A protein has these predicted regions:
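Terminal low-complexity, poorly structured segments
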Residues: 8, 12, 76, 95-97
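A short, exposed loop/beta-hairpin motif centered on an aromatic-Gly-Thr core
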Residues: 77-88
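Short, flexible active-site loop motifs that bind/organize anionic cofactors or intermediates
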Residues: 2, 39, 80-81
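A short, charged, amphipathic alpha-helix used as a generic interaction element across diverse proteins
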Residues: 86-105
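Short N-terminal "domain-start" leader segments
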Residues: 7-68
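Glycine-centered tight beta-turn/hairpin loop motif at sheet-sheet or coil-to-beta transitions
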Residues: 38-39, 73-77
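Short intrinsically disordered terminal tails
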Residues: 1-13, 103-108
């Protein structure tokens, strides 16, 4: 018996495409992050994060009054290299897509 595949909402399709741009294909769960200091690039394993959050960066000079997606590793927050987004809903969709891709069985 086969079941019909549920239709994917357009917002999720868009968010999956956004998140997929920053996947690092070395192993499941790796995504590009904004480097700190003099690093040229950075990547983190979202599977190891304690939380994935959306953050309203009012005080951030780089993205004033925008929403970003961050991975928390204990007390350290790492901004993922997606966005920034104009509204919270977009950031939540992308955070959901990042988790979906990170824990997907389809990755190498």
């Amino acid at each position: 018996m086969s079941h019909a595949q549920p239709e994917i909402p357009e917002e999720l399709r868009w968010a999956l495409a956004e998140a997929d741009k920053e996947v690092v294909a070395v192993a499941p769960g790796w995504f590009r992050a904004w480097p700190t200091g003099d690093e040229r690039w950075s990547a983190v394993n979202v599977r190891a994060a304690t939380q994935v959050i959306v953050n309203h960066s009012r005080e951030d000079d780089r993205h004033p009054d925008a929403w970003t997606v961050r991975a928390l590793f204990g007390t350290k927050a790492v901004e993922l290299r997606v966005g920034p987004y104009d509204n919270r809903a977009q950031a939540i969709w992308v955070a959901h897509a990042i988790l979906s891709l990170a824990f997907s069985d389809d990755q190498p």
